[in-house]
A protein has these predicted regions:
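Signature of extracytoplasmic/envelope-associated structural regions
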Residues: 1-200
Length: 200
């Protein structure tokens, strides 16, 4: 839904929504979540008729909970890579994309909008960058990339109870990194790393 003030202006909502893609971006300043997908129908308060979206009346705006507009606590996070897992303190950025490859039945003759959805083979890709260091975990990460050996990766966003999000991938195949020397410290950029999983 999408509500605006005053309540007499056009409000909008979608029905039958399905998530096609989730993108999680992390860097030293902020974390962001981006959701993309399709919906069966867009309804609005200006042209709503009973029965649209299976509703008899346009939905009222939900009551807002208390919000003090303060900064979300626990911005600091952790990243663990490898087997056995080792904590990395040199991550500068990460971009994780989960794509469901949804197929909508919307190409049949005479059908107005998607009739249903079918999930495809999920794709999970990871891009990340770390500062180069002369230590065993960093060397092992490079060796895993060179040998195309799957490794576990875990990202924890936040460090306070009630304000945390974790993303765990059991088998990520790292690509050989690009050496980025645009700054004073050398960064290794791993792009297009694929997470492996089970198909059922």
């Amino acid at each position: 839904f999408d509500y605006w003030s005053p309540g007499t202006i056009v409000q909008r909502a979608v029905t039958g929504a399905v998530m096609e893609q989730l993108r999680v971006q992390v860097n030293g300043d902020f974390h962001s979540f981006e959701f993309k997908g399709q919906a069966k129908e867009l309804i609005d308060s200006a042209s709503f008729q009973a029965g649209q979206g299976g509703l008899q009346a346009y939905p009222e705006e939900p009551q807002l909970g208390g919000f003090d507009y303060s900064i979300v606590p626990g911005h600091i996070g952790q990243v663990w890579i490898g087997s056995p897992a080792k904590r990395f303190y040199t991550l500068t950025e990460a971009d994780i994309v989960i794509k469901n490859n949804i197929d909508t039945r919307d190409r049949e003759f005479g059908v107005d909008g998607p009739a249903c959805v079918s999930a495809g083979v999920r794709q999970v890709t990871v891009d990340f960058a770390v500062y180069e260091q002369d230590n065993i975990p960093t060397r092992e990460l490079y060796e895993a990339a060179k040998n195309r050996a799957p490794i576990p990766v875990m990202l924890q966003l936040g460090n306070q109870s009630g304000a945390m999000f974790a993303l765990y991938m059991n088998a990520v195949v790292p690509e050989v990194p690009e050496f980025d020397d645009r700054e004073q410290r050398l960064q290794w950029r791993f792009s297009g790393c694929r997470a492996q999983g089970v198909y059922n």
